[in-house]
Amino acid sequence: MGTMTIDGRKVEFTDEKNVLTVIRNAGINIPTLCYHSEVSTFGACRLCTVEDDRGKTFASCSEQPRDGMVIYTNSGRIKKYRKLIVELLLAAHCRDCTTCVKSGECILQELAHRLGVRDIRFENTREQHEIDDSSPSIIRDPNKCILCGNCV
């Protein structure tokens, strides 16, 4: 058992496996794309990055909670960092959002809106791949892949 300070608020924790779980249990919503509580930590998306009282940033999904930690989940620096991550993900993503079947239900689209991403300032230099529709039940479009690990 221990106590952390999250955004100025004291929060007690018991045996949570990572800082992200403590933060979410405290009612704070932090975005993630790759995290699943029942699967081993992947830590690829970095959207759950937080900042400690010394200015160190880290992925909250892969850091164990320690008594006395002071965490900031939504500082100006962290907001800019998350926005940049989404911009980079979109830059390497296909640009068919308006015609995509997931438009309006897309987690990446929702994050971009939530974080204020209006334009993609980076050029898309990603190579285009063929769609794999060889299965009658699954269509795999590698051009939509954002390397989150959810499909694995």
What are these regions (language model features)?
Residues 1-9:
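Eukaryote-biased recognition of intrinsically disordered, low-complexity regulatory segments
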Residues 46-152:
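Fe-S ferredoxin-like electron-transfer domains
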